[in-house]
């Protein structure tokens, strides 16, 4: 019986864990990353080092793999969408488009009737100052921030006046809340609409 070939975009820590779990299931892993220092390189069966829009690599990757997934959310949507037009990408690229952007993500969660902290989209310093009622708050870049990067704690209007905002970025201002507990919930839906 032929082994399943799993294509994984991104080579970080989650890619390592995915490769280790796949080995236990006798799944062959092909990791594609644009980072030569990717830790998953050491755990994958095959490693492709290239930027994600390399046509030659796209052709090779999609011919070699049976399924495609990604191990972090910052794979460009257009790349995932292109790959998905050739070979199925799971989760669907549209889901990743939402989680790549904190504003879209918060809107989506609220549309599901799940309450979040109060938040506002911020385009410039005037927006920031006019939403002082949310202070103290966290100002975050709408995209590409993770593990504390692109995040700024604002305690008062003076902090808002002193912060420098990039004209090339959208931001989200999130009201601080007193946490009693933080939990993470992962839900898996299989193709036959079974949930775990």
Describe each model-derived feature in a short phrase:
Residues 98-196:
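Active-site nucleotide/adenylate-binding loops and adjacent lid/helix of ATP-dependent enzymes
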Residues 1-104:
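ATP-binding N-terminal substructure of ATP-dependent carboxylate-amine bond-forming enzymes
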């Amino acid at each position: 019986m032929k082994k399943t070939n799993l294509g994984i975009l991104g080579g970080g820590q989650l890619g390592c864990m995915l490769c280790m779990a796949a080995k236990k299931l006798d799944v062959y892993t092909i990791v594609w990353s644009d980072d030569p220092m990717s830790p998953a390189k050491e755990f994958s069966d095959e490693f492709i080092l290239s930027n994600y829009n390399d046509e030659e690599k796209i052709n090779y990757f999609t011919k070699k793999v049976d399924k495609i997934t990604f191990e972090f959310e910052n794979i460009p949507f257009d790349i995932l969408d292109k790959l998905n037009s050739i070979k199925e990408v799971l989760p669907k690229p549209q889901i990743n488009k939402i989680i790549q952007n904190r504003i879209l993500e918060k809107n989506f969660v609220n549309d599901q009737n799940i309450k979040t902290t109060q938040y506002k989209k911020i385009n410039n310093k005037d927006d920031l100052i006019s939403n002082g009622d949310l202070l103290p708050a966290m100002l975050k870049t709408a995209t590409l921030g993770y593990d504390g990067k692109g995040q700024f704690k604002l305690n008062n209007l003076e902090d808002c006046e002193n912060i420098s905002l990039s004209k090339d970025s959208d931001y989200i201002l999130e009201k601080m809340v007193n946490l009693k507990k933080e939990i993470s919930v992962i839900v898996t839906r299989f193709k036959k609409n079974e949930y775990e």
